[in-house]
């Protein structure tokens, strides 16, 4: 005799319903499929962004070109400014030199007059007219004052060490009383114009005695 099927209890029915409900941590087939589609879309977008954009590349290249041109222009401007400053400085130096030494030729022409006046004053005997002596002396002083006004100064190295930069040795004489290479006589004074030698002093220089 066949047995009647057993009727499920309420507890068994509740358990079966719980098992049939999806759990929070479990994904359904539809959800899994949807997630796959989303991932594919995101990957496609990333790939699209990674693809080269010809217009963007051209724009970036143009920007780089302009930046380089700007840097070159700044460099050229700086170089031009430096060159202009150098030119201006050289021009100022040339003007200063011209101002200082424009009188050099004229001074050289006047120096023989000064030499003549000095020799005339030295050669006058004590019995010479005081008026004449005073006249020559005043003329010489006036001449020297004018030269000094324009930056001319005499080189009178009597008793000083011989300096070939500003002295010209006419002869050397043994002299045990002074150090060798000492100027013992000035035959003709030298002159400087604003610190530049116009004429060396002609001198006699001592040398060691034999």
UniProtKB/Swiss-Prot annotation:
Entry superkingdom: Bacteria
UniProt function note: Participates actively in the response to hyperosmotic and heat shock by preventing the aggregation of stress-denatured proteins, in association with DnaK and GrpE. It is the nucleotide exchange factor for DnaK and may function as a thermosensor. Unfolded proteins bind initially to DnaJ; upon interaction with the DnaJ-bound protein, DnaK hydrolyzes its bound ATP, resulting in the formation of a stable complex. GrpE releases ADP from DnaK; ATP binding to DnaK triggers the release of the substrate protein, thus completing the reaction cycle.
Gene Ontology biological-process annotations: protein folding
Similarity-based family: Belongs to the GrpE family.
GO MF, one annotated term: protein-folding chaperone binding
Name of protein: Protein GrpE
InterPro entries per record: GrpE, GrpE_coiled_coil, GrpE_head
GO cellular component: cytosol
PANTHER family: GRPE PROTEIN, GRPE PROTEIN HOMOLOG, MITOCHONDRIAL
Cell location: Cytoplasm
Listed Gene3D superfamilies: 3.90.20.20, Head domain of nucleotide exchange factor GrpE
Region ranges (Disordered): 1-31
Subunit composition and interactions: Homodimer.
Keywords for this protein: Chaperone, Cytoplasm, Stress response
Basic and acidic residues composition-biased segments: 12-21
HAMAP family: GrpE
